[in-house]
Each structure stands twice: as structure tokens, then as C-alpha cells.
Amino acid sequence: MYKRQLVRKANTTDNRILSLIEYNNEDVKQENSNKNPAVNSVQRDYMAGEVSRDLTTRMLLPHDIVEADREGIIHFHDSDYYAQHMHNCDLVNLEDMLQNGTVISGTMIEKPHSFSTACNIATQIIAQVASNQYGGQSISLTHLAPFVDVSREKIRKEVISEQELVGMEYPEDVLNEIVERRLKKEITKGVQTIEYQVITLMTTNGQAPFLTVFMYLNEAKNEREKKDLAMIIEETLRQRYQGVKNEAGVWVTPAFPKLIYVLEEDNIEEGSEYYYLTEPVSYTHLRAH
């Protein structure tokens, strides 16, 4: 008698939620290769998704749409997020947030004073965006390029200060070479921050951010910025070609971020100024596939 009462009280989502908690829901196991249904955060996302799906089919959608979906005439996407006022994808305006500051979790984030810090802030923005939507997002490396020169000037001041400390002065060409070498190390560090943060961050929906990185030289506002952007792109391609080590210590190509590289007159033809960037793009693409 008591069991019969429980059955009558059972919610329409009970069986599916219990099956995913016990890890015996085959639909969930096959649903999304980017989510591991054995992980607690993923299970919580799926539990919320079942509630949303139930509300969507019982209360929010017209009956004919629900029936057409069940019969396979159409497919209604993302019913597991439909109940919330949540959007899908974003083109992230990194430029505005980096240049003018932003707020993350109630904390004021001011304009960064180095390229590596700008990259770190960018990954925090990416994580926040990914945790408050259910689709992908895109950023442009052009928005990070101005901070290369910020770091250049900062490094120059540091080198000059070191000269004064030891009582010597480098010739201008030597000074410039030291600055550029240190700058390249900073660019490597910043790009690596984005690469590793993106693939290791776990957002509130239990997965790494679906990030696309846009690489377009002619978005740069001037020639100095364009050359700095080229350095960022070159390092991004180098690290993507190298890959990351998996749990077995084997180098693999990460699924994210996706890279989009734009071809124009100054990089498409052999012998053009930035063709040296275009060649490794093809190698990176072949290795990824």
C-alpha cells in the first residue's frame, strides 16, 4: 500500500534523474562527449536539465510542437535549458572589458598592466560567460594585442632600472633585443595561460568552455599592433601544434579552443609579409585531424 502511494506521488522526472545519478542512463552517457556523466558537477547539470525538460514539455511548449518532437518530425533543441531565461552563444567583447575594466563576482577588475595579466583576466571572463549560457563563445586575439606594447614598455623600464642598479648602460640595439626577448617569454606565458585554463576550467554546467579564438591580422588598429598581434598568433599556432599532454603523458591536440585564421592579401601568397604564419596553420590543421 505504501509503495503504491509513493508511485502515485512520483514526479514525472524521478526515474530519469535516479538513473543518471546511478550512472545507468544510456541516453545521458551518449548525449555529449564533452561531459563526463560520472562527475558530480555534470550530474547536477543533468538533474537541472531534466527539470527544465519536464517543464518545457508539460507547460512551456505548445502541444503540437511536443508531439512533433516525440514523433521525430522535428527536433526541439536545448529543452534542458529552455525553462531558464538563458541565451545560447556569445561574441565576447573583450576589448571593452579589458580597456575599461569589468566586474567579476562582485570584484572590480581594472585595466591590466601586462599582456600575461590580460590573458589571465580573459580566461576568467570566458569562465564566467560559459557558466551563464549553454553554447559556445568567441574571442578575438586582436583585443589582447594592445597589451603586448604595454608589457614592452614595462619590460623596458625594468631593464633600464637594472642597468642603473649595476652601473652600466646597454647600447640601444642591445637594450631593444633584451626587451623583445623578455617580451616573447611573456607572450608564451600568456598564450599558455589561455590554452591550459580553457581546457582545465570546469564551468557550472560541468564542462570546459566551448571557445573559438579569432585570428585576423587586419583587425589591428595600426602597424605596431598588427606586428604584435602576429607574435600572439605565431605563439598560439606553435602551442596548438605542440598540443598538451594527456593523463598518459602523450602529446595530444586539445578540442578547445577552436582556432579561426583569416586569409588576406598580406598572408595568403607565398612571399607576402605574414605568409610565415599561414604555413604553420596548414600543419596545425593536418595534425589536429
Model-derived features with residue positions:
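Conserved small/polar residues in nucleotide/adenosyl-binding loops
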Residues: 1-5, 284-289
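Often metal-dependent polyanion-binding catalytic scaffolds in large enzymes
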Residues: 3-183, 199-203, 209-215
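Short, Φ-rich (hydrophobic/aromatic) sequence segments
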Residues: 123-126, 194, 277-282
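Structured alpha-helical segments in the cores of large, soluble enzyme domains
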Residues: 164, 186-207, 229-249
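Hydrophobic alpha-helical scaffolding
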Residues: 177-184, 188, 222, 226
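Extended, regular secondary-structure scaffolds
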Residues: 218-287
